[in-house]
């Protein structure tokens, strides 16, 4: 798709403060799904080379944004979008004072979703996921990470990953899949966590890698999940098969999972409410992103805040994601998460936008192809009818998305 965008106030997110401030009316040329040229100068006032690249004769479609805001497409770098079942009853239990850990010990929580997901077909899982995905797309999302983890058998984990990848055929969006077989201990392995981890490493990871069903492997490293030794075994196996690693770490306690994730050069360590300074230092010495999940923090009514000031002090990149899931974050709006990150965690609007663009791209391994508006990068963009990028964090509920561009293809969300 060849597309020329004119009169866009560009928020590139490329270079610090400058990349956050909207440019004067700019032009962006898109060819073969990539950004071919950018100019913030009036027509005829840029270099001859840039003017030639942006000549309308090279493009089959032109869109005049008339001063509307153009940002990178938003990236949701942590979701559990594929699942069956309903856990609204647990919401009431928590409101009555039953803690999440106790619900899980009673066989609720993740395992109730496991039962429903195992009973669903791949086609049913796709249909159930589409409304959730549509909510994300309506908030400007162009890339979504989707985890497995509600199957916990080889057959059902593969089913979930195939359903996730199939979403690309249903909607104009990029899907990245992550194996999260080490999400919870399935009933068949009750009391035998080491045996289950052996099963994950010997039976599930090799098939997932062979069939190219995931690019990363994640582990729920927590007191009600898997310990450090078990997590490390999964990480080591994933690396052996050429897969990236990610961690659900320090959500409910400090086990050192974040430091382990950083040691294995993980793409991201997610949740991190109980992360201490040693863990932050470990992140700062790696390329591992700290992913904040304010939806789960809010929904669980947690009080332990992630160490935002330490993350700033040590210059650790912070991503933000929805954590869409049936038990602890049933939210499908990434701009709502931006607002929560600002109001609950005290991020700035600039940090929030960078957290769902540049840093979210890094958390998925796309540092050099997504998350900023830059020549040579993927043409994944969002068009907004707003005055300033801070409005994305400030306003909640107002319909502000005009359209999305994915791989250079324009999709209207009420504009043009």
UniProtKB/Swiss-Prot annotation:
The keyword NAD does not apply. It comes from the Bacteria. Pfam families: Amidohydro_1. This is Imidazolonepropionase. Binds 1 zinc or iron ion per subunit. Its EC number is 3.5.2.7. GO terms for biological process: L-histidine catabolic process to glutamate and formamide; L-histidine catabolic process to glutamate and formate. GO terms for cellular component: cytoplasm. It catalyses: 4-imidazolone-5-propanoate + H2O = N-formimidoyl-L-glutamate. Its main location: cytoplasm.
């Amino acid at each position: 798709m060849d597309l020329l965008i004119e009169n866009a106030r560009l928020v590139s997110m490329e270079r610090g403060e400058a990349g956050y401030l909207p440019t004067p009316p700019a032009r962006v040329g898109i060819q073969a799904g990539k950004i071919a040229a950018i100019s913030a100068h009036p027509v005829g006032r840029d270099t001859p080379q840039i003017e030639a690249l942006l000549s309308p004769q090279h493009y089959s479609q032109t869109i005049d944004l008339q001063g509307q805001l153009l940002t990178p497409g938003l990236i949701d770098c942590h979701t559990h979008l594929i699942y069956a079942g309903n856990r609204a009853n647990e919401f009431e239990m928590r409101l009555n004072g039953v803690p999440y850990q106790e619900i899980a010990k009673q066989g609720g929580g993740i395992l109730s979703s496991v039962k429903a997901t195992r009973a669903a077909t791949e086609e049913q899982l796709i249909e159930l996921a589409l409304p959730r995905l549509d909510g994300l797309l309506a908030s400007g999302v162009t890339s979504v990470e989707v985890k497995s983890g509600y199957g916990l058998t080889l057959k059902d984990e593969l089913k979930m990953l195939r359903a996730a990848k199939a979403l690309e055929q249903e909607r104009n969006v990029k899907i990245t899949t992550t194996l999260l077989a080490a999400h919870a201990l399935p009933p068949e392995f009750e009391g035998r966590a080491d045996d289950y981890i052996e099963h994950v490493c010997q039976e599930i990871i090799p098939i997932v890698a062979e069939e190219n069903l995931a690019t990363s492997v994640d582990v729920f490293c927590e007191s009600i999940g898997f310990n450090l030794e078990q997590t490390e075994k999964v990480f080591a196996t994933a690396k052996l098969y050429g897969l990236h690693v990610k961690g659900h770490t320090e959500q409910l306690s400090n086990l050192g999972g974040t430091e382990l994730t950083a040691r294995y050069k993980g793409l991201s360590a997610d949740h991190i409410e109980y992360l201490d300074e040693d863990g932050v230092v470990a992140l700062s010495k790696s390329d591992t992103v700290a992913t904040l999940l304010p939806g789960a923090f809010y929904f669980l009514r947690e009080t332990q805040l992630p160490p935002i000031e330490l993350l700033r002090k040590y210059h650790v990149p912070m991503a933000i994601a929805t954590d869409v899931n049936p038990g602890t974050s049933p939210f499908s709006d990434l701009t709502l998460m931006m607002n929560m990150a600002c109001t609950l965690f005290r991020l700035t609007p600039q940090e929030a936008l960078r957290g769902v663009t540049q840093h979210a791209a890094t958390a998925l391994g796309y540092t050099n192809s997504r998350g900023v508006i830059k020549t040579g990068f993927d043409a994944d963009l969002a068009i907004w009818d707003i005055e300033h990028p801070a409005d994305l964090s400030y306003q909640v509920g107002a319909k502000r998305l005009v359209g999305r561009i994915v791989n250079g293809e324009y999709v209207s969300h009420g504009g043009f």
